[in-house]
A protein has these predicted regions:
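Solvent-exposed, non-transmembrane regions of membrane-associated and secreted proteins
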Residues: 2-301, 321-335
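Selective detector of the "anchor" transmembrane alpha-helix that sits immediately C-terminal
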Residues: 302-326
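Solvent-exposed, low-complexity, intrinsically disordered
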Residues: 337-339
Length: 339
């Protein structure tokens, strides 16, 4: 009896180990599914709006669309001095507009797709913790991406969240990489034009640059830490969104895996240049940085394989324990019969 109890205890311990092993993968898969649902819901809302046009609406929707007009007026208010009030974290967490007031299921104005990083996320209004747990988020008191002159939409994303990649591999982005932003009115193509590393207190990067049409991606840096911010600027390109085949072809052909030279701006305003290896998401220059970061990435990316291996080990162990238990049971019966 004692032996059988030990066997079942061992079996339960292995099941618990499998749960610990598979847990991060399952959580990550769940988070990615939630993000996919947000994107799908946005496209469904847009499709519904297109099939139910307003009575006074023209073919282009934009001039008469109330949401667009509100977004346009909001951007103009920022250009006329509205960003001067941006002084605290609370200012970027809230947003003056709500997409839900204009028929969008969640407070999402669109999606952002980055082929180099293999992600597409919902674009929430307001960079608060709730929104950033579900996708990318536009800072309050920064522009909405309408494709008009003198805009800078500051878009924040976690450097990975509960197993979902989000902006984790932002260091793979290189100059001229495309970024696609889809709103209820159009899909805009932006091209990466500059990359910086700044301090958390520096908010100059999210300010409007008159005459330029920008989006600015922001995430914590280095990976796994948050004492800096990694900023990627992308400028509006006049091109139309290409076909999926063309997107994949450009993504495969244009990648440069060599280290990048990135401008780093310090708290005192001075700057220098640091080397960032896109294959290693810790660019601090330490000897262990690349090895450590790549191990973390490998562990995260290979969690699916590890989960299956763990499941197989536990399944085989369970079968073996079951067989051993049955054998012991039969031996016990034979022993009683012989007595």
């Amino acid at each position: 009896m004692a032996r059988r109890i030990r066997q079942w205890i061992g079996f339960l311990i292995m099941l618990a180990g499998l749960g610990l092993l598979a847990g991060p993968f399952l959580l990550g898969a769940r988070e990615e599914k939630v993000q996919e649902q947000v994107v799908d819901t946005f496209y469904q809302d847009v499709k519904k709006a297109e099939t139910e046009p307003a009575a006074n609406e023209t073919e282009t929707r934009e001039p008469q669309d109330p949401f667009y007009q509100a977004a346009k007026a909001y951007n103009e208010s920022l250009l006329n001095g509205g960003q001067s009030a941006m002084t605290s974290r609370a200012d970027v967490e809230q947003f003056a507009l709500s997409a839900q007031d204009y028929g969008v299921s969640e407070n999402v104005i669109g999606t952002i797709r980055i082929p180099r990083m293999e992600i597409e996320l919902g674009l929430y209004l307001g960079a608060n913790s709730e929104n950033m747990a579900k996708g990318a988020a536009i800072f309050g008191m920064t522009s909405l991406p309408l494709g008009r002159e003198s805009e800078n939409a500051a878009i924040a994303g976690h450097r990975g969240w509960r197993g979902a990649p989000m902006f984790r591999e932002i260091q793979k982005l290189q100059i001229d990489d495309p970024i696609y932003v889809t709103t209820p009115w159009q899909t805009l193509v932006y091209r990466v034009c500059e990359i910086r590393i700044v301090t958390p207190e520096d908010n100059s990067w999210c300010r409007i640059q008159p005459g330029r049409t920008l989006i600015s991606l922001m995430t914590c840096h280095p990976y796994g830490q948050n004492y800096q911010r990694y900023i990627v600027f992308a400028e509006l390109s006049p091109e139309d969104k290409p076909s999926e085949e063309a997107i994949r072809a450009e993504n495969a052909a244009s990648y440069d895996p060599s280290p990048r030279q990135i401008t780093q701006i310090h708290a005192d305003g001075t700057s220098d240049t640091v080397t960032v290896d896109p294959a290693a998401i810790r660019p601090d220059g330490s000897e262990y940085g690349a090895v450590l970061s790549n191990f973390v990435i490998l562990a995260e990316d290979k969690m699916r394989i590890a989960a299956w291996i763990g499941a197989a080990v536990v399944a085989l162990s369970g079968i073996w324990l079951t067989v051993q238990t049955l054998r012991d049971f039969k031996k016990g019966e034979k022993h009683h019969e012989s007595e």
